[in-house]
Amino acid sequence: MKLLGLLLLVFTFMALAFADEKDCIARGQKCVGENKPCCKGTTCMYYANRCVGV
């Protein structure tokens, strides 16, 4: 039973990690005019049109 709980926990964290990637723009990608925010830990530099680390 402990193994099942552990596997469920691992799969839940994996699903959350993969879902975050699809809903945001990765570092170094163009961000101006896109309908998505930059990923966590990055911000859109409008003059450079790129997501950069904070």
Swiss-Prot record:
Molecular function per GO: calcium channel inhibitor activity; toxin activity
Give compartment(s): Secreted
**Tissues where the protein occurs:** Expressed by the venom gland (posterior main gland) (at protein level).
Q: What is known of its domains?
A: The presence of a 'disulfide through disulfide knot' structurally defines this protein as a knottin.
**Any idea which UniProt keywords this protein has?**
Calcium channel impairing toxin, Disulfide bond, Ion channel impairing toxin, Knottin, Neurotoxin, Secreted, Signal, Toxin, Voltage-gated calcium channel impairing toxin
- For the keyword Signal, the answer is yes
Signal sequence interval, chain numbering: 1-19
Where exactly are the transmembrane stretches of this chain? none
Give the family this protein belongs to, as stated in its UniProt record.
Belongs to the venom Ptu1-like knottin family.
Q: Which InterPro entries match?
A: Assassin_bug_toxin-like (IPR012325)
In UniProt terms, what function does this protein have? Binds reversibly and blocks P/Q-type voltage-gated calcium channels (Cav).
This protein's GO CC annotations: extracellular region
Q: Which cysteines are joined by disulfide bonds?
A: C24-C39, C31-C44, C38-C51
- According to its UniProt entry, this protein's organism is Platymeris rhadamanthus
Q: What is this protein called?
A: U-reduvitoxin-Pr1a
SUPFAM superfamilies in UniProt: omega toxin-like
